[in-house]
Amino acid sequence: MSLRYPISRIRHFRCQLRELLAAVAGPSIRIFDAGTGSLLSSWPPASYMRPLDSEISPDRASSAGTCAEPPEKRRKLTPPVDESGEAQTEQSAKAKARKSQTAEQAWSTIPILVISGTGDHIVAVTGEDKCLRVFEVKQDGKLTQLTERCIPKRPCAISLTPDNNTILCGDKFGDVYSLPLLPRDEVVLPLRKAAESSKPFQPSATKLTVHTQRNLKALEQQLRTPRAAQEKLEPSFQHRLLLGHVSMLTDLILAPVPSDSSTSPRLYIITSDRDEHIRVSRGPSQAHIIHGYCLGHTSFVSKLCIPPWDPRSLISGGGDNCIICWDWLAGRVAQTIPLVHDGDVAESTKAQPPQSDAPDIAVSGIYAIPFSGNPGLTEHASGGILVALEGVSRLLAFSFGTNGRLTALAPIELSGNALDVVALDDRGTILVSVDNVHKPGSTKELRDSAIGPKLLQCFSARSDGGLKWEESSTQAATTINSREAVDIIAETESRKQVQKISDSLYGIGNLRKWARGEDG
């Protein structure tokens, strides 16, 4: 089966008065003109993008943008001297080339893509190598990598401070630290390791003291890799630890709140984790001070969203069958909104009883869509809230009223599972990236062909007899959907690549605890 990479991330931004689109397709970032959809640049350059069914020279791996690490000790190999072994030598060379192919492809996904407020920098995280990369964007759309920093623990959320000078990075193990967007002086800190004790590592727990199957598996893992439990690595670049969770961190946003006593807004760091917690901490200079918590979820929290028109409201969602709207400064639940009941959007004013046989919900995105540029829409609502569920081919739509309450609207039906949403303007126009590889509503079954289906769909909010969403069209979406040759994955590698695509697109449901009834 031949297929195109789906667009897993898409961003709309303005760079020096020019509107651009940044899209992630597989292992690459592509910059498009937001008006025409023409491709302006791509990273990595085409010369470094290895075709999956072709061979490359082994000396290109270091120039493909992978993070520099201390070289391993090399073993000297003596070439064969027997002239009759030319065929064997040629076969050996091909084997080395195949190994170099595997070594070069240090990542296959780009899970995080953030645009600076000025639009001239992009921060991205490449998947398998856990490398945080900063790019410069020119008005002509040219993308140039400026820095790369390998993170010891996998980054799961990135945010930029309002001055666009500092990156806040949250990692898989719950730590949040700050690092400069563009370090002035290259400071390389040695990787620090915890001192090894004279006694061999021995977990404090035993098979007689653990009480759950989950803890037993964790103990067995520690016993299998005792040295890994002793070793703790820290970033080898300039950074400052701000705060930490005792659970896996899932999302992070930086929330500025207008202050009555000063001209500059007060900053807060809002973080969520796998253990149903939402923490509100003070800004980077006082991040050790916890302002409060927003407690009310009963499953993991995967996504946070603050509408730009109401900075004191927070909308959160994850593994529960509802989203929650908070007065986050007070830590108070303002509204609980059911998401799905028997496959239909539930009314926002009624609580639906949970059903044991209902499919598990995993919120993959919460998006705030502004209406400020469309007076006809602002008569009905301050903006729109769209919720994407993992493996669901529709967007759940809500209106955000002037009273701060959400009201459910008819869902937006898509041609494939929703992957990402971006607002194109402040008049209620959006682009939705959809999964062109899997069948709608499934994360396992594949389409017969992934070349024909759309990569992007465009929708606009209408106020005819009430607020609703209708499909529309843009030149950019039409042009991008018609692109084929540059995106096609080779037939010989499609099976392996489809599995990688599935893993990269649908991983939020894995945050759910292993089984109901087990402790956290």
From Swiss-Prot:
Per-repeat ranges for WD: 105-145, 244-291, 296-338
Principal location class: nucleus
Disordered: annotated segments: 51-102
Gene Ontology annotations for the cellular component aspect, listed alphabetically: cytosol; nucleus; tRNA methyltransferase complex
Cellular compartment(s): Nucleus
Pathway linked to the protein: tRNA modification; N(7)-methylguanine-tRNA biosynthesis
The keyword Phosphoprotein is assigned to this record: no
Function comment: Required for the formation of N(7)-methylguanine at position 46 (m7G46) in tRNA. In the complex, it is required to stabilize and induce conformational changes of the catalytic subunit.
Name of the protein this chain belongs to: tRNA (guanine-N(7)-)-methyltransferase non-catalytic subunit TRM82
